[in-house]
């Protein structure tokens, strides 16, 4: 089973003391966002090892390692998990006789980090809880070449969103209905989808190519590297971007979060942690 990561974060009250804590200590120098965990900041950071499995599994079988640091201006989060296979292609174009066709058997490893904007938080997407999250997504093929993450909002509502909002109706754990939408933040994203080339070049060419992000879509840096059967992924963002679609962090603030992992973009296994707490010193 392969793991990729997603961190979902929410501000809360009393329940914060009941969950394991990921402590983000203040450091003089933040780590370089290069997909490596050899910086001094990471060596001194406190590690949290969290169980990760299917949402309803009470005794997780896998573990994921988390660390966090900040410098008073920006925060960095490090995720490390075991994955025996490196999947860093996503539906590339493969030459088939006389034309390029998407190879849908190739799907990337994937992880995301989300922070609550409104409502009660539950790490289970099918909990049926109305809420909004600020979400960061790292993708081994689509985002990693650019050094940035997708920055978007997850919204869960009982009422159907306006027709202009692309949404999906899901059945929750109690057999109720909830609508899910996940628009990207305003601005230019860190990759774009291209048309298949008409003339043959390489046998396989990417369908998604990096581009320079701008606006709120450029808030989150992210870089991952696979080595020795593990993914190492680093994220970095300002504590407070000033954008309405981003969760604001601050020293002394405690925030609920969870980590989810996607094998080959959920064409394989999808796992998630129970609720954890990010504590910013």
Feature locations, PLM:
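Acidic/polar low-complexity flexible segments
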Residues: 16-36, 93-195, 227, 241-281
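Order/disorder boundary and secretion-linked terminal/linker segments
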Residues: 15-90, 198-203, 207-214, 259-281
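A generic structural signal for beta-strand entry/edge sites
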Residues: 72-76, 110, 228-234, 254
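Glycine-aromatic-enriched beta-strand/loop faces of beta-sandwich-type recognition domains
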Residues: 179-223
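Sec-dependent N-terminal signal peptides
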Residues: 3-12
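Beta-strand-rich interaction surfaces with strong enrichment in secreted/lumenal proteins
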Residues: 64-67, 220-226
């Amino acid at each position: 089973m392969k793991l990729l990561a997603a961190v979902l974060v929410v501000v809360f009250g009393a329940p914060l003391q009941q969950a394991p804590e990921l402590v983000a200590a203040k450091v003089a120098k933040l780590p370089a966002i290069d997909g490596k965990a050899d910086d001094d900041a990471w060596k001194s950071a406190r590690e949290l090892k969290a169980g990760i499995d299917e949402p309803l599994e009470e005794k997780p079988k896998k573990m994921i390692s988390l660390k966090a640091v900040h410098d008073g201006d920006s925060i960095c989060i490090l995720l490390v998990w075991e994955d025996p296979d490196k999947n860093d292609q996503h539906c590339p174009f493969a030459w088939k006789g006389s034309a390029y066709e998407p190879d849908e058997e190739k799907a990337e490893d994937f992880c995301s980090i989300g922070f609550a904007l409104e409502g009660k938080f539950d790490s289970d997407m099918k909990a049926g809880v109305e809420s909004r999250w600020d979400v960061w997504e790292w993708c081994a093929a689509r985002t990693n070449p650019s050094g940035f993450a997708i920055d978007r909002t997850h919204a869960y509502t009982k009422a159907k969103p306006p027709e202009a909002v692309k949404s999906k109706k899901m059945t929750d754990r109690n057999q109720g209905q909830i609508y899910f939408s996940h628009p990207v933040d305003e601005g230019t994203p860190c990759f774009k989808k291209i048309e298949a080339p008409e003339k043959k070049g390489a046998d396989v060419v990417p369908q998604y190519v990096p581009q320079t992000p701008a606006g709120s879509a450029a808030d989150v840096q992210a870089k991952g590297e696979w080595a020795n059967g593990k993914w190492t992924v680093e994220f970095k963002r300002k504590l407070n971007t000033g954008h309405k679609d981003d969760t604001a962090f601050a020293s002394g603030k405690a925030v609920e979060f969870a980590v989810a992992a996607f094998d080959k973009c959920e064409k394989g296994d999808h796992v998630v942690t129970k609720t954890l707490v990010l504590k910013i010193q």
